[in-house]
Amino acid sequence: MKLCYQNIQITELVNDWHEQEKTIAFIPTMGGLHQGHLSLIDIAKQKADKVVVSIFVNPAQFDKNEDLDSYPRSLNADLVELEENVDSVFVPDVKQIYPNGISKYIDVGMIGRILCGKTRPHFFNGMIQVVEILFEIVRPNVAIFGQKDYQQLLVIKQMVKNLSLDICIESGEIIREKSGLAMSTRNQYLSENDAKIAANLYRILTYVKHEVLQNKKIDVLKKMAESDLKQHFKLDYLEVLDANTLKQITDNTCQIIILSAVFLGSVRLIDNIIFLKKDNYV
């Protein structure tokens, strides 16, 4: 495994691979690796000859009142986990990524202004900045992201399309704890009791899916589910939408997604479930 701290190091490495006609799969992370990240590496190995993982806690996607300083960092443990699993790890500092400071604005479009983009308006602009920069440096053939951050996935796909980048964007399924809680680096903030409470998010989303498949009215379902969520969390949003557009479900909808974001204390949790729409859906 080649460990790269500077842009020039990873650039020289990927140039050599491209000259050898090797394909490159890329997984951007902020570290704090868990089984969800490792599942993306498994996908990457199937999609390309070489696998690169980046570890960079991106300050551009944190608001001033968020957890940039306290975000879980475990670089040594992450590198041990990656040692036998990837070909290179890119660990840049802020000056490598933003040599002229964080100033670029990228229009993330409608998809980036709803749901998480509505309550965290800074997030997708900061996220898309760093992803575009990393794509320019690593020049992958394919990049893999987790389904848990589903809205982020769609924003990235839209960016790749808008910029005509020759990069295939793949996604990996949500990996869950035995309780159903979606794995996340921020789960480290949860106490044992909080983790049990957090599992209610997936339970409620699963219930909504079951009822949607029974053709129950979505407006009624949402009110019931929101009431249930508020028994355990501070609710940010709960939506049942077309999975491809994040708009209201229509006759042309093929897949439905149920998305929610909640707060448990100061910890923000997101989750979603995607499923095929029944032919007789009303």
From Swiss-Prot:
Protein name stated in the entry: Pantothenate synthetase
Residues that coordinate or bind ATP: 30-37, 146-149, 175, 183-186
Recorded superkingdom: Bacteria
Gene Ontology molecular-function annotations: ATP binding; pantoate-beta-alanine ligase activity
Homology family: Belongs to the pantothenate synthetase family.
Residues reported in the UniProt entry to bind (R)-pantoate: 61, 152
Lineage, broadest ranks: Bacteria, Pseudomonadati, Pseudomonadota, Gammaproteobacteria, Candidatus Pseudothioglobaceae
Listed EC numbers: 6.3.2.1
Residue sites binding beta-alanine per the record: 61
Keyword Plastid found: no
Main location: cytoplasm
Positions annotated as active site in the UniProt record: 37
Annotated localization: Cytoplasm
Keywords: ATP-binding, Cytoplasm, Ligase, Nucleotide-binding, Pantothenate biosynthesis
Function field: Catalyzes the condensation of pantoate with beta-alanine in an ATP-dependent reaction via a pantoyl-adenylate intermediate.
GO biological process entries: pantothenate biosynthetic process
Coiled coil spans: none
The protein's assembly and partners: Homodimer.
Other information: The reaction proceeds by a bi uni uni bi ping pong mechanism.
Gene Ontology terms: cellular component: cytosol
NCBIfam families: cyt_tran_rel, panC
Catalytic activities: (R)-pantoate + beta-alanine + ATP = (R)-pantothenate + AMP + diphosphate + H(+)
Metabolic or biological pathway: Cofactor biosynthesis; (R)-pantothenate biosynthesis; (R)-pantothenate from (R)-pantoate and beta-alanine: step 1/1
